[in-house]
């Protein structure tokens, strides 16, 4: 596989963490963010100062700002508020999930309704800037990954998020397929069929992929895919959180579910405990002052063993194996046909997950694929393919769910079956169900059920102007066209009159093209102001940290001369006054003045034996540097068998 140099970045937009990669000097490189990490928490916070925080900065303040700190947005994107999975999250998320006017999922951000793609766009902006800072020039094109089992609306909503972030999304690629590209990148020998088991923070996918290698030319063909877009590490966390809440209630008689701050602290500790239990057999969840009642403060200190955690989540792991069985059946394969098993997603680091997958396939999963980075690497490879930088690679992906229309009797008639290789196009002739019917409604559906009502409604449109005729006489040609992103385009044509209507199925993001363009223009126009605001806030935060540490040092200082104390307090007052304004330069000057004048405090510190003047200066320097759908009109179609020419 020959690799040159390209500028189409690959982004793994994850539920829990996101990652960005690019092709550089013939190799794929995962890029570190501004905090020095190769992955970025998919967390976005909106502060009282109107600052938007992304990643670790957002995560750090989540305990004190739970209602405006958003995580696991990927579980909500492209969904309806009434969806069962959404209603489950409504009851457990610290932030407020609301319904838009048309019934889509939106979020309450500081008492304003915001669409999930708009929030996800902030993560994509961070990934974009991470890449730009690394290569030193503007990035406008990207390949973004989605769970293989994402439906059409979820895919389109992801593209909307990319557009809002200022990115031209060249391709939406399935996460397991991307992982297969990463796995097959350097493999030189032979053809093989692999299983990609992808258990991430919020979603689960299984894909069966055949890699053909003929004279160095590699074809990655997805044979089948299946999954659950609402099953992942967040659900594992929830099981542990519920256990801890119940144990605490038994001990103290207090239900922490009524305390958002306590629940946010518990979520962080539960995630940490879960991760620790992948390498140790017991850990403590120790949260002092978790809550209080009339008798005083209450503390949580509960031991959790690996065995206990496994008993809590084992059912979830077994739940992932059902789609695996279905995917093998759809591919007409047996377990023995699988050559390699690739684990992707952070939750696959759990020993019990690895054991259950190993037991199922009868072989140990590969250990040479980084589960946190493989998807972004594969996305970068696909970006290279699109740019012409990666040679001798052909990717054949599939549509995860069947697509069709509602016909007579409320039945879904399938036009494109699940696991059909994309891009693809299929047409079928339908007719009217009543005499002199002048219009039909094309109701587009996605799913595997026979009853239309049991499937996902993607949208509908009308074809009118049909010439009067007996029922069954007009010929209406319905065409489904799926592009390489897995996004559906539908047309209906009256073959007698030539009248035609088309629709591109759009996401349930509640965002029109005009709204998306407006958000993008606002983002671009305010970019410089946003940077200045961010720098000002960082400087004010540094000043706050310095004021806090200086006051603490004054309290600890022994025999501090009154004259010196007065001098330091004057500088403190000047800095406090300065941070009430908007002059960043003045704040910086006042910071430096306070650092200089307070450096003498070390000489009077109670901890002088452990702290010298150099340490104080280093500390201060460090602080400076860390700156609803309409009712369906009956679409009464009667299928006419295709006439052969």
UniProtKB/Swiss-Prot annotation:
Keyword Cell division among record annotations: no
Modified residues (Phosphothreonine): 203
Induction: By stress conditions e.g. heat shock.
MF terms (GO), sorted A to Z: ATP binding; ATP-dependent protein folding chaperone; unfolded protein binding
Pfam families according to UniProt: HSP70
Function of the molecule: Acts as a chaperone.
Family membership noted in the UniProt record: Belongs to the heat shock protein 70 family.
Protein name according to UniProt: Chaperone protein DnaK
UniProt organism field: Wigglesworthia glossinidia brevipalpis
Gene behind this protein: dnaK
């Amino acid at each position: 596989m020959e690799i040159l140099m390209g500028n189409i970045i690959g982004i793994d937009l994850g539920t829990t963490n996101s990652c960005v990669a690019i092709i550089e000097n013939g190799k794929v490189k995962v890029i570190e963010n501004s905090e020095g990490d190769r992955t970025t928490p998919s967390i976005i916070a909106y502060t009282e100062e109107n600052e938007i925080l992304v990643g670790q900065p957002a995560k750090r303040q989540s305990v004190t700002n739970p209602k405006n700190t958003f995580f696991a947005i990927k579980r909500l994107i492209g969904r309806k508020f009434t969806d069962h999975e959404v209603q489950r999250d409504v009851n457990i998320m610290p932030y407020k999930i609301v319904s838009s006017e048309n019934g889509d999922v939106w979020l309450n951000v500081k008492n304003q309704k915001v669409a999930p793609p708009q929030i996800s766009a902030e993560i994509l902006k961070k990934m974009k800037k991470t890449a730009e800072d690394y290569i030193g020039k503007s990035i406008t094109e990207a390949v973004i990954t989605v769970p293989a089992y994402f439906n059409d609306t979820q895919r389109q909503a992801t593209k909307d998020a990319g557009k809002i972030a200022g990115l031209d999304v060249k391709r939406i690629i399935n996460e397991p397929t991307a992982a297969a590209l990463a796995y097959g990148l350097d493999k030189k020998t032979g053809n093989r069929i692999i299983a990609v088991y992808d258990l991430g923070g919020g979603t689960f996918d299984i894909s069966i992929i055949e890699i053909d290698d003929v004279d160095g030319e590699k074809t990655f063909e997805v044979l089948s895919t299946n999954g659950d877009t609402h099953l992942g590490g967040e659900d594992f966390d929830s099981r542990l959180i519920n256990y801890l809440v119940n144990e605490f209630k038994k001990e103290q008689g207090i239900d922490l579910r009524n305390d958002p701050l306590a629940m946010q602290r518990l979520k962080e500790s539960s995630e940490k405990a879960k991760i620790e239990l992948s390498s140790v057999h017991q850990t403590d969840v120790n949260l002092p002052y978790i809550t209080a009642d009339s008798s005083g403060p209450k503390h949580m200190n509960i031991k959790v063993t690996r065995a206990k955690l496994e008993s809590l989540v084992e059912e979830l792991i077994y739940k992932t194996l059902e789609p695996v069985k279905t995917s093998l059946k759809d591919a007409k394969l047996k377990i023995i046909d699988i050559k390699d098993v690739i684990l992707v997603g952070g939750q696959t680091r759990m020993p019990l997950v690895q054991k259950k997958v190993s037991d199922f396939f009868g072989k140990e999963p590969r250990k040479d694929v980084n589960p946190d980075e493989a998807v972004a690497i594969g996305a970068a490879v696909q970006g290279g393919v699109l740019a012409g930088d990666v040679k001798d690679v052909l990717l054949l992906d599939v549509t995860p769910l069947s697509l069709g229309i509602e016909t007579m009797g409320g039945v879904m008639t399938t036009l494109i079956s699940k696991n059909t290789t994309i891009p693809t196009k299929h047409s079928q002739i339908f007719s009217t169900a009543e005499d002199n019917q002048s219009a039909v409604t094309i109701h587009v559906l996605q799913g595997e059920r026979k009853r239309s009502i049991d499937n996902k409604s993607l949208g509908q449109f009308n074809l009118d102007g049909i010439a009067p005729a007996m029922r069954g006489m007009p010929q209406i040609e319905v065409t489904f066209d799926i592009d390489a992103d897995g996004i559906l385009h539908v047309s209906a044509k009256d073959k007698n009159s030539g009248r035609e209507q088309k629709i591109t199925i759009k996401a349930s993001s509640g965002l029109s093209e005009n709204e998306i363009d407006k958000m993008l223009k606002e983002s671009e126009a305010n970019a410089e102001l946003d940077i200045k605001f961010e720098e000002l806030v960082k400087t004010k935060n540094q000043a706050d940290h310095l004021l806090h540490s200086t006051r603490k040092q004054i309290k600890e200082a022994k025999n501090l001369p009154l004259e010196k104390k007065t001098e330091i307090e004057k500088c403190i007052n000047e800095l406090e006054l300065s941070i009430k304004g908007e002059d960043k330069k003045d704040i910086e000057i006042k910071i430096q003045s306070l650092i200089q004048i307070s450096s003498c405090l070390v000489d009077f510190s109670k901890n002088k034996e452990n702290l010298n003047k150099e340490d104080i200066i280093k500390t201060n320097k460090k602080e400076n540097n860390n700156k609803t759908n309409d009712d369906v009109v009956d679409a009464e179609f009667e299928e006419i068998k295709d006439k052969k020419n």
